[in-house]
Amino acid sequence: MSVYYGSIEAGGTKFVLAIADEHFNIIKKFKFATTTPQETISKTIKYFKENRVSAIGLGSFGPIDLNLSSKTYGYITSTPKVGWKNINLVGQLKEALDIPIYFTTDVNASAYGEMKNTGIKNLVYLTIGTGIGGGAIQNGYFIGGIGHSEMGHQRINRHRDVLTFEGICPFHGDCLEGVAAGPSLEARTGILGEKISSDDPIWDILSYYIAQAAINATLTLAPECIILGGGVMEKPNMISLIQKQFISMLNNYIDLPCSVEKYIRLPTVKENGSATLGNFYLAYSLFTKE
């Protein structure tokens, strides 16, 4: 009997569903826009009823409740996304599909996928896109006590050239996400990020903020590498700008385990597939435990 694994990337703008064979090769994939919880969850249930799998890995936007002893385990909790606050995502899926579901954050899933693809068991994954999130793995396991990390909302030093910008985070204003996520570019300049020229000074400002997040991760978690994904990182030369800022900020305080080019890097899984691969392996971990 063939074994198949499912992946759900539950994003704030789109859901990506995928099926893999027992060797983690994608055999089917389906994307659709994230709309209302009812419509979006119904589409997901329909897909997996038509494409049966043994277990599902689910990486979701958040915040989410990962505390297994909590009454709201499996919920999307205090999200700013309209209509999605306090939605029992896992509960609805499990009731309809009756299969094991491994629930974690979207960035944790990406971190896990990168770990499996590279063999590196101590890493941090930061995604810089519509929002900012971070996942970390130490010795092959996710970090976190009763919940998950919220690296996107860490406090950072403001760039001296834009002290008047209040930030866009609805909770904290000028946290990392508030000043460095994709929408902050348009809020500051009035221009969509993808239309801003590569030599605009705004990219130096963004790299200054993202490099601070990399410094914080380095000094608190001591990973083997930091992986930067998300739409903002698709800008040409963005990674090199961040690497230069990082080296300047670190100021030779500690030795890195490798060159900065290998230490701060882009994802190794092609076509934004880190989370999908991670979800497959997380589903596998549940299936083999059953």
UniProtKB/Swiss-Prot annotation:
It holds the Pfam family ROK. Signal peptide: none annotated. Its EC number is 2.7.1.4. It catalyses: D-fructose + ATP = D-fructose 6-phosphate + ADP + H(+). CDD domains: ASKHA_NBD_ROK_BsFRK-like. Transmembrane segments: none annotated. Inactivated by EDTA. Inhibition by zinc ions (Potential). Zn(2+) binds at H153, C169, H172, C175. Gene3D superfamilies: 3.30.420.40. One of its GO terms (molecular function) is metal ion binding. Keywords: ATP-binding, Carbohydrate metabolism, Kinase, Magnesium, Metal-binding, Nucleotide-binding, Transferase, Zinc. Its cofactor is Mg(2+). The keyword ATP-binding applies. ATP binds at T130, P183, G231, V232, M233, E234, K235. Homodimer. Belongs to the ROK (NagC/XylR) family. This is Fructokinase. It comes from Lactococcus lactis subsp. cremoris (Streptococcus cremoris).
